[in-house]
């Protein structure tokens, strides 16, 4: 089944480029940039990838991102991810990048963007993988800081297709960012937002009604609110679900408890994604395979999930 799932044409719609930084590349970039790491070797770092919640993961994620300093670093990061896409027949990807993670430590916005954009362009020309880049605001920072990030991004508006919202969810509702999302839409960008991962269903309502999103990232807690479920089904609002991430961060205790197939069978436009694959133990195919292994996902369900991902693209072919 793994090989069949791997060969299935699919799109990935929920992937943080910084979260695809494999330990081997992290160590190589640290050496290139002469950065001392707190881990003695790759295996020690891998052992640190045990998380009880979203915040524990984010602490390590931001620490790891510190090795990314030059446009070449961001190119190498993105290119390594695109090679994984090629291996797994991901024919289209819409990755996130978090400029604030880098600008807050003194890396110029254009250094980050130039490296990523060059790799995505080469990915289309050399690997045949189409893409649309999403600029994501960090929700644990202020709305004013998000506005400043949008200011920095506007001169490069052609390089990305949408804005998103990620990082620590609890205590940072979508409503906190309503004005910056209004402005981004006015500037011509599409919008997506993480909601209903650790946060309550109310955050999903806010993302839909206040941020006017095209897609919900995660959204697994929608199932707790029947009226919300009906709206998501009626309006066919896609959910970019990340099964391995959800179990690794204890949103579900075990994959056998995951609700993605229940939502699929109810008519929700759910998709399968890897989120931060270097940290969560798998890329898209591994996520599909986990659903087969632990939830008995059938080939028919896998085909529908893959088709949903192609249908839910922001960048249409």
Swiss-Prot record:
Database matches in InterPro entries: A_deaminase_dom, ADE, Ado/ade_deaminase, Metal_Hydrolase
Cofactor names: Zn(2+)
Biological process, per Gene Ontology: adenine catabolic process; hypoxanthine salvage; nucleotide metabolic process
EC identifiers of the protein: 3.5.4.2
Database matches in Pfam families: A_deaminase
Substrates-to-products reaction catalysed: adenine + H2O + H(+) = hypoxanthine + NH4(+)
GO CC entries: cytosol
Presence of the UniProt keyword Manganese in the record: no
Gene Ontology MF annotations: adenine deaminase activity; zinc ion binding
Taxonomic superkingdom: Bacteria
Active site positions: 197
Bound cofactor: record note: Binds 1 zinc ion per subunit.
Positions annotated to bind substrate: 276
Binding site for Zn(2+): 14, 16, 194, 275
Described purpose of this protein according to its UniProt entry: Catalyzes the hydrolytic deamination of adenine to hypoxanthine. Plays an important role in the purine salvage pathway and in nitrogen catabolism.
Protein's name in the database: Adenine deaminase
Organism encoding this protein: Pseudomonas fluorescens (strain Pf0-1)
């Amino acid at each position: 089944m793994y090989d069949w799932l791997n060969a299935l044409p699919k799109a990935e719609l929920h992937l943080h480029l910084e979260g695809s930084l494999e330990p081997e590349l992290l160590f190589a970039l640290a050496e290139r940039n002469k950065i001392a790491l707190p881990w003695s070797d790759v295996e020690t770092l891998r052992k640190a990838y045990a998380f009880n919640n979203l915040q524990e993961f984010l602490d390590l994620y931001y620490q790891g991102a510190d090795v990314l300093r030059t446009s070449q670093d961001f190119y190498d990061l993105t290119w390594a991810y695109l090679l994984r896409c090629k291996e797994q027949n991901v024919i289209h990807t819409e990755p996130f990048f978090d400029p604030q993670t880098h600008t807050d430590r003194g890396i110029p916005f254009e250094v980050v963007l130039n490296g990523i954009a060059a790799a995505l362009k080469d990915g289309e020309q050399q690997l045949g993988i189409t893409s649309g880049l999403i600029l994501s605001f960090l929700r644990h920072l202020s709305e004013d800081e998000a506005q400043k990030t949008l200011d920095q991004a506007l001169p490069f508006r052609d390089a990305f297709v949408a804005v998103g919202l990620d990082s620590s969810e609890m205590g940072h509702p979508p409503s906190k960012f309503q004005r910056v999302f209004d402005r981004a839409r006015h500037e011509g960008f599409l919008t997506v937002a993480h909601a209903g991962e650790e946060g309550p269903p109310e955050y999903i309502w806010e993302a839909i009604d206040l941020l006017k999103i095209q897609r919900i990232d995660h959204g697994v807690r929608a199932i707790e609110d029947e009226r919300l479920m009906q709206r998501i089904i009626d309006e066919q609002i896609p959910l970019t679900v990340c099964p391995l991430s959800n179990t690794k961060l204890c949103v579900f205790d075990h994959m056998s408890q995951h609700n993605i197939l229940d939502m699929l069978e109810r008519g929700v436009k759910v998709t399968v994604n890897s989120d931060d694959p270097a940290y969560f133990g798998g890329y898209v195919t591994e996520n599909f395979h986990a659903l087969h292994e632990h939830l008995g996902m059938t080939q028919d369900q896998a085909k529908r999930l893959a088709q949903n991902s192609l249908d839910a693209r922001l960048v249409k072919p």
